[in-house]
Every structure is written in C-alpha cells, then in structure tokens.
Amino acid sequence: MSLNINDIYGFGKAPPAAWQYAASKDGFIHSNYGYLIWHKDNGNQYDKVLKELQENPTSRRALMIYQRPSIWDEYDLDGCSDFICTNSVAYYIRHDRLDCSVSMRSNDVVYGYKNDYANPKCLFYEFIVSQILFSKPIAE
C-alpha cells in the first residue's frame, strides 16, 4: 500500500510511462487506488463499505471517496502531475441487485480508462459481491 511507483513496481520492473510522467522526481503519486480505499491512513474505506452493506443492505452510505482536500496543494509538488481522476464510487443494493455509480473528475482514453474502469469493476465483482453473497464478517 505505497504511494511510490518504485515500491509498487519494484523487482527491476520499470513502471509504465504514464506513471513515470505523473510521479514526482522521487516516484510519489496520488492515484494508487488501492492505497486510497484499503489503507488505514485513508480510512480503510473498503472494509467500512462492506460492513455497511452487510449490516444495512439498503444503505446510501456505502461510498468510497478517492479525493482529499489536500490534493490541491500536493498535485504538482516536486514535478508531480497527478490529480486523482476518480472522485468516488457508491455501491447500492436494490431489489436484491448490487449496483455501483462512479463519479469521475476526468478520464482519458489513452492512459486512464483501463485503470479507472477496472478498479470499480474488480471491486464490484471480485470482492464485494463474493463477500456480501457469502456474508463473510468484516474484521474490526
């Protein structure tokens, strides 16, 4: 759960050119979505959303927020050009069906779309559906 592309892609593998362009001189990035939703320093939002949907399936609070106010002061520090594209992803269970709504600030087809599309889709199908359907308890 790092915000440095050198940690994420380590083991001698170079980060993709788009990440190198967006990162600071030292490899710092803002858009590590895994960090933004799973790390305790950013609220461990994934577990909170799962717990909310398990305990209150009709909730409107099952929301992961990918932005933070400090991005305005940080997005261009030390050569960085990384202003997070995804604003939030909201999950809803209605009529025994799980839906999600993604709010984007920006999404470019060349570099961002694959990641910005894959992230909520992966969470939706691989993690949330299986954990909600099989009622796995969330550790506190």
For each predicted feature, which ranges?
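Terminal, non-catalytic protein-protein interaction segments that mediate quaternary/complex assembly
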Residues: 1-140
